[in-house]
A protein has these predicted regions:
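Long, contiguous, structured domain-core segments that constitute the functional module of a protein
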Residues: 283-442, 447
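Long, charge-patterned amphipathic interaction tracts in eukaryotic proteins
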Residues: 117-190
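Short, charged/polar micro-motifs that form catalytic or ligand-binding hotspots
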Residues: 78-81, 85, 89, 101-108, ...
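Conserved structured core elements
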Residues: 60-63, 82, 89, 93-97, ...
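N-terminal-proximal low-complexity accessory segments that begin disordered
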Residues: 2-145, 152
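Generic, well-ordered alpha-helical scaffold segments in large soluble proteins
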Residues: 98, 102, 118-125, 204, ...
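Extended, regular secondary-structure scaffolds
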Residues: 170-350
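Short helix/loop capping segments that flank catalytic or ligand/cofactor-binding pockets
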Residues: 115-116, 148, 192-193, 223, ...
Length: 451
């Protein structure tokens, strides 16, 4: 067998001990498993280098593993006469715990969470998309600062990169495929820079008839957490402060109807663990419980909204049914985490905060798209789909009602779809002898097939 801990304490740095001068347990063990014993021990620090790890042989790796195991036995402080399964499992569990805490530090780092949140949001959208039904998803690697710089460098909007990429290359090019919507993982605040960026995006979106979906976080409301946002007593008066002058002015513009801002974020995945998301390589238990709100992985709700848009398009041919629990606004199968603080299982809801129906109505009237979680259920719902535009008030009720309809995204998606089709009809019928009635009949037949 391997040397005892008593002998290990005497040699400290060595991980292998010879029982006889001519032959060693180490050599005998390697011979039985068809490996060659190494001539010299290496420092364990070199295994922190990925390149050294990849270049090492199986003999060196196993020897290093034996070194670590013998050091664990030495640190136990008690003699070990034999190695049984319980002892080995105990030390394996200790190693798993140490690796788990190191992995926690990586997974819970804000920068890593930002990357994982983005890709898990994209994956959730891709998983819910049937690409056989005339649906395409294209990814554009672009940060919010890069887009802001793009608009600042362009002398005018029509020379910006976003305009060239979306309007010129697709909507305005024969054979191009008009883009139905832009979905972003960006969170906007009410600063002058972000409002100016939203204004520029809205101009491009209106030109190409492609609504833009973004999101807002607690920073938009000048709060630190969404719980503080939900606790604002008079949300209407909150937006009458001087900090929101630019935002309120943007809401008065015509192109603001092409911008949708969702809130709050949703749970991207369950914490890793044998009962939630097991890891096969080792026993990883992620240390996350309900109060550790910042340790959970949250994803942007814009991807959930986009998934509902895709479902509506596949079912109806356009993105109209995207709000209401029975009309396409439900977000199903959200992860539910059960945790125990010593008083029994408790539930971590899959959204950052509970939004009551009254508060949801207030947020919607202020130009946001709230996602409301259904209590004691595994789903949430978009009850409204208002754009950021503030509906105008007119002297007649009909005019005011029309203004409200014009500010709703389902109506904008409908108009955008028709605008895309009209562009194609106009282009394809250049030079033909079709009169207005034939073109009108062709358009009506197309619309009739979608209703």
């Amino acid at each position: 067998m391997l040397m005892s801990v008593q002998k290990e304490n005497n040699v400290a740095g060595n991980a292998v001990s010879e029982t006889h001068s001519g032959d060693s347990v180490y050599a005998s063990l390697f011979e039985k498993i068809n490996l060659n014993p190494v001539s010299a021990l290496s420092a364990l620090d070199i295994w922190q280098d990925p390149q050294a790890m990849s270049e090492a042989s199986a003999d060196e790796r196993l020897t290093a593993g034996m070194q670590v195991f013998m050091e664990c036995l030495a640190k136990a402080g008690a003699p070990v006469e034999k190695l049984d399964k319980a002892l080995i499992d105990h030390h394996i569990a200790e190693l798993d715990y140490q690796i788990s805490r190191q992995l926690d530090a990586v997974l819970h780092h804000p920068e890593f969470q930002k990357v994982e949140s983005l890709w898990r949001g994209v994956k959730s959208l891709v998983d819910k998309t049937d690409f056989r039904r005339n649906v395409k998803i294209e990814l554009l690697d672009l940060s919010k600062d890069d887009l802001r710089q793009d608009f600042e460098d362009a002398p005018e909007i029509i020379q910006s990169g976003l305009y060239l990429q979306t309007y010129v290359a697709e909507y305005d090019t024969p054979g191009g495929e008009p883009i139905a919507a832009l979905i972003s993982a960006w969170e906007f605040d009410a600063s002058a820079q972000d409002v100016a960026l939203l204004k520029n995006i809205s101009r491009v979106a209106a030109s190409a008839h492609m609504p833009f979906i973004g999101s807002v976080g607690p920073a938009f409301f000048r709060k630190d957490t969404m719980e503080e946002v939900a606790a604002i007593k008079d949300i209407g008066n909150h937006f009458e402060r001087a900090e929101y002058i630019k935002w309120n002015a943007f809401r008065e513009t015509d192109d603001a109807r092409y911008i949708g801002l969702v809130m709050p974020r949703v749970l991207g995945r369950l914490p890793y663990g044998p009962d939630t998301v097991p890891v096969r390589s080792f026993n990883y238990v992620e240390e996350v419980k309900g109060p550790d709100h910042h340790k959970y992985l949250w994803t942007n709700a814009s991807f959930a909204f986009a998934a509902n848009m895709v479902r509506s398009f596949v079912t109806n041919g356009w993105c109209v049914q995207i709000r209401g629990p029975q009309a396409g606004g439900a977000v199903q199968d959200l992860p539910i985490h059960l945790y125990d603080l010593g008083t029994g299982n408790q539930v971590k809801i899959p959204s950052e905060v509970m939004i009551p129906e009254t508060r949801e109505f207030e947020f919607a009237n202020l130009g946001f798209i709230p996602l409301s979680y259904y209590k004691n259920r595994d789903y949430a719902c978009f009850f409204s789909a208002n754009s950021t535009q503030k509906p105008a008030l007119y002297d007649t009720p009909d005019a005011t009602a029309n203004s409200r309809i014009n500010a709703r995204l389902p109506y904008i998606f409908l108009l955008s779809r028709i605008a895309h089709y009209l562009k194609i009809i106009q282009r394809e019928n250049i030079g033909t002898t079709k009169d207005r009635r034939l073109l009108e009949l062709e358009l009506n037949n197309w619309i009739r097939g979608l209703v």
